[in-house]
A protein has these predicted regions:
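Structural preference for solvent-exposed beta-strand-turn elements
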Residues: 1-424
Length: 424
């Protein structure tokens, strides 16, 4: 995939539906009684893996061009899988569905692609085992493939060593099949889509500080869900609008959940001109984002804000390379166990373009403001890396090519078309 320099990006754009919310809508709709209608569903490869897994467990799911009908069968309505459950590249599918499968009355196996088979699953296996679950890594390396022998579980309180919405969600979902109140405490609050949506479906989930708790055996009932635009997908257009000279972009109906809005706060710290319009704070908060070209400067990103922007750090790193001054990103060791080691991959590729960047154990230091040139970028099949460097390619001197650039289909199949449409 080759990217060329552009100026004057203008127009309106509705980014795809939020990936985290799309996953959960299908999962919880499958466990609810009745038909759940989901509009603006993200039809990326990861979310389609979730649909595939629940279809294999007997759930009828209709897909009508982004409108999904999930004919749920209730909390105990899943059937023995017709085949091994293939999660593809999706960590969310793997970790959340494991919590559900642990409480079923059947045996299941999860597999996935090479990338997911290298990502850490001990972080969910540990709490599930303490609930009495029978879950094992088939290769004995605490990774996928996993074998889960479902049975009733015992309630626990789990102190999670990491702020991870996937770990928290896994434990809460398993807690629905337990014998009492199950709770999870995190060191820092992670995204809370599971808590919001489970309550919407009828579960009893309470949150206090960084602790979330769920009562067992909830009766979940079908709902209608409109998925907001994914702020992680909007991030690339926010960055492009800020960096590309002469630009003004309106991004419609973007999710601005406070557990996900760290990117907006960092952009403001860097001097960004971003205006929130049509703000709606009911349920999952949303707003239209008006983004104008800005002169950015370096900042420090670390501490409690990290879980609210962990997926946006590759894009922030690119922004920092074009901003004046030094940006320090720290407390982000989680980047090392994403689809790629995003610390090393961002440092390697930005260095190829002439950026002054030093990787650290938990982040990176970027001395910005140097002119960057085109290069051959290796995405390592990481969709967020590919999209971040596509934005960089709009600004650098000379063409930039992205090896494995098609991996954007994981979360944003029409990404390149949308990007160039704004430059027409």
């Amino acid at each position: 995939m080759e990217i060329k320099k552009l100026t004057n990006l203008h127009g309106e754009l509705t980014v795809p539906g939020d990936k985290s919310i799309s996953h959960r809508a299908v999962m919880f709709g499958s466990l609810a009684k009745g038909t759940t209608k989901i509009t603006h569903f993200l039809e990326g490869a990861d979310c389609l893996s979730t649909i595939s897994c629940f279809r294999k467990m007997g759930i009828d799911i209709e897909n009508n061009s982004g409108e999904i009908l999930v004919h749920g069968k209730g909390l105990h309505g899943l059937s023995v899988p017709a085949d091994i459950l293939d999660v593809g590249n999706s960590g969310t599918t793997t970790r959340l569905i494991s919590g559900i499968l642990a409480g079923q009355n059947f045996v299941s196996e999860l597999t996935g692609d090479d990338s997911i088979q290298s990502r850490p699953m001990k972080r969910i296996m540990t709490p599930l085992l303490s609930m009495g679950a029978d879950i094992a890594s088939i290769k004995g390396n605490n990774c996928v493939p996993l074998r889960i022998i479902g049975h009733p579980l015992k309630a626990i309180h789990y102190d999670s060593p990491v702020a991870s919405a996937q770990v928290k969600s896994c434990v809460l979902l398993a807690g629905m099949y337990s014998d009492g109140i199950t709770s999870v405490t995190e060191p820092v609050l992670s995204r809370n889509h599971t808590e919001i949506m489970l309550n919407y479906f009828g579960a009893q989930v309470t949150s206090e500080g960084t602790t979330a708790s769920i009562a067992p055996e909830p009766s979940l009932f079908a709902r209608e869900i409109t998925v907001p635009g994914d702020i992680s997908s909007a991030a690339y257009f926010i960055a492009a609008g800020l960096l590309v000279p002469g630009s003004e972009i309106l991004l419609k109906n973007v999710g601005i959940n406070p557990t996900r809005d760290g990117l907006l706060r960092v952009c403001k710290d860097m001097g960004a001109d971003i205006t929130l319009l049509n703000v709606n704070m009911e349920g999952e908060p949303t707003a239209d984002l008006l983004v104008r070209t800005s002169s950015l400067h370096g900042t420090t990103v670390g501490g409690e804000i990290i879980p609210t922007l962990i997926d946006e750090i590759p894009m922030i790193a690119v922004m920092a390379a074009f901003a004046e001054g030094t940006t320090v990103i720290k407390d982000a060791k989680e980047l090392k166990v994403k689809e790629s080691d995003r610390i090393l991959v961002m440092a390697e590729n930005l260095s190829r373009m002439g950026a002054d960047i030093t990787p650290t154990e938990d982040g990176m230091i970027i001395h910005g403001g140097k002119p960057l040139h085109g290069a051959e970028i290796d995405s390592y099949l990481d969709h967020r890396v590919a999209m971040s460097f596509a934005v960089a390619g709009l600004l650098c001197d000379g063409p930039l090519s992205i090896k494995g650039g098609d991996c954007v289909k994981i979360s944003y199949p029409e990404f390149y078309e949308d990007l160039y449409r704004l430059g027409e």
